[in-house]
From Swiss-Prot:
Name of the protein: Chorismate synthase
Catalytic activity: 5-O-(1-carboxyvinyl)-3-phosphoshikimate = chorismate + phosphate
Family: Belongs to the chorismate synthase family.
InterPro entries per record: Chorismate_synth, Chorismate_synth_AroC_sf, Chorismate_synthase_CS
Residues binding FMN: R132, S133, S134, N244, A245, G289, K304, P305, T306, S307, S308, R330
Role according to the record: This reaction introduces a second double bond into the aromatic ring system.
Amino acid sequence: MSHNTFGHLFRVTTFGESHGVALGCVVDGCPPGLALEADEIQAELDRRKPGQSRFTTQRREPDQVKILSGVFSDDRTGGRQLTTGTPIALMIENTDQRSKDYSEIRDSYRPGHADFTYDAKYGIRDYRGGGRSSARETAARVAAGAVARKVIPGITIRAALVQMGPHAIDRTNWDWEQVGQNPFFCPDAKAAALYETYLDEIRKDGSSVGAVIEVVAEGVPPGLGAPIYGKLDADLAAAMMSINAVKGVEIGDGFAAAALRGEDNADEMRAGNDGRPRFLANHAGGILGGISSGEPVVVRFAVKPTSSILTPRQSVNRDGAEIDLITKGRHDPCVGIRAVPVAEAMMACVLADHTLRHRGQNGERP
């Protein structure tokens, strides 16, 4: 299996399966001399780990990260653990697998999952929890994102769940402080209360629901990205689309821009106090011509409902026989909830990569 690595200069390779011994990542290209401790990575993993509320899978994984390489400390570093510029290997052990839950689907294809497509491509698949196609893999991305944030300390990255099923938040109630105060990473307290009742009903029905996640990066300097095939928004779209269950991505106003007139969509400018243009709007989501404008970079993506549900679905098995299939196991009723910290991590990795690429071509400008 190839294509387990992304990035150009800040490169992340993830490894592992849902029910394997461990999963993790190797981060290559991180500059030397950056302070990096395991507890900083752990803080990000703790936001994503399962079993923290009744609204996520009840699989209970501590997700304890181990730094295997790429850091060093002694008296000359003042006791601080610093990156050395060599590959940083991070490992997270799996401790709460229940593979027996999946024995009945060994030769069956779960609707909406990658069972059939993995079989069609490789002729073999790890059916236990979805193997490599499981959202469990995203724990490694979150770990890598914690390293990426060290490369871009001046950039603030935050994400939130802004829609669950048909219920979108009221944007006039947006409060970033609320994101950490409810189990949905929701910036609207009223919407979070609604989601609690709504998702309880979904869970009782043995069903699932989709979501929309919005991730915002502030403090991004103008100039990151490149024309045509190195566009910042193209790389961000690819990064977000690579997250499990994501089926659509938009930048800035995205698809809503199609309904606007040109004068409504224009990000007009006036002279700023720092000698740079001051934008009067940000319909473009902080990216123009594939290059960052200095405005907040705004990305949204849609997450489909979790495919594993408790009502019978029509399918077939490897022999071509038609079957009715109920998916057992422990699953998220809304996988979009735990996609929030994953979105931040992917934004961080892409921006770290583009920061290093920009420096390589243009020095420290901007």
